[in-house]
Amino acid sequence: MPIATPLTELLGIRHPILSAPMDTIAGSRLTRAVSEAGGFGILGGGYGDRGRLETETAELKGFAPFGIGFITWSLAKQPELLDIALDARPQAIMLSFGDPAPFAPRIRASGARLICQVQSEEMARQALDAGAAILIAQGTEAGGHGASRTTVDIVPAIVDLAAERVPVVAAGGIADGRGLAAMMMLGASGVLIGTRFYASVEANGAQEAKERIRMANSNDTVRGVVADWSRSLFWPAPFTARTLVNDHIRRWTGREIELMQRAAEVGVEYAAAKAAGNFEVAAVFAGEAVGLIHDIPPAAEIVERIATEAEQLLTGRRNSVRGVLPSPLVGEGGA
């Protein structure tokens, strides 16, 4: 039986599993595949490539349910992109890394739910004041951009702050049903998953990048600024990017000031490497959950695996599941 939570009820989905809006990686194929499997796919709006956004949203018009996610500080530079997104009639718009207030009225007026990703209580209060319908509490284990607090710290803190006013979704270091079950025990209504879906058939990433995720372990990631500054992307504090370690990261870690001074030169090298698929220079944005990823299956299979394993844990079924929950807690499978 699917796990019912306030999140599944609010979004009308079978499983409390959302796929992260990973810039260009989370295209319409991945978004649709996750939603068709009973989760909630979120298209990546990224840094605001208008042409790509128009193409990807055109593929999703008339489809439901799905969401579209934006980097808030980048969207502020091209606010007209929100109109393109809303024209596709998504069920939700997800905003991360910035003040959602300037965009919240238009989102709510469209009928879409406002999802806000936060990394602190202050950000959560700001999101609630803006009318967020769902909060995503992101831990530092997450791939791509994030802050410094761990998932097991930030999730219950945001759950307590929300005080059941809105569902809270956990993000960061989650790749299987054990992660979903654990986050629900912390009070989350579901999970947002990125890296595990990056290593899926439908993700837009290069096959070499997916293979690097599959072969990596959790010690092979690092959080820092090298990948961003190599692209002349200077994110606001406190946000940094978690990537797989490669030759380029090793070369410039500890030399960030020099990197900033040589950003134009390094940027040419980085862009050429990305175009050539050279991932010893170009970054693979991935989280600490890489150590739990050992294959590259269809997204639907990932959703079903996670949902089934979590259900087994939360209902106390022991077949093929390790580390089951103590008996006083099983069978309460909601959040």
Say what each PLM segment does.
Residues 59, 64, 141-143, 268, ...:
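Intrinsically disordered, low-complexity segments enriched in glycine/proline and serine/threonine
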Residues 117, 172-173, 332:
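Conserved acidic functional residues
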Residues 148-169, 175-322:
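Conserved active-site-proximal phosphate/metal-binding subdomains
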Residues 1-167:
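Active-site entrance/lid segments in N-terminal catalytic domains of soluble metabolic enzymes
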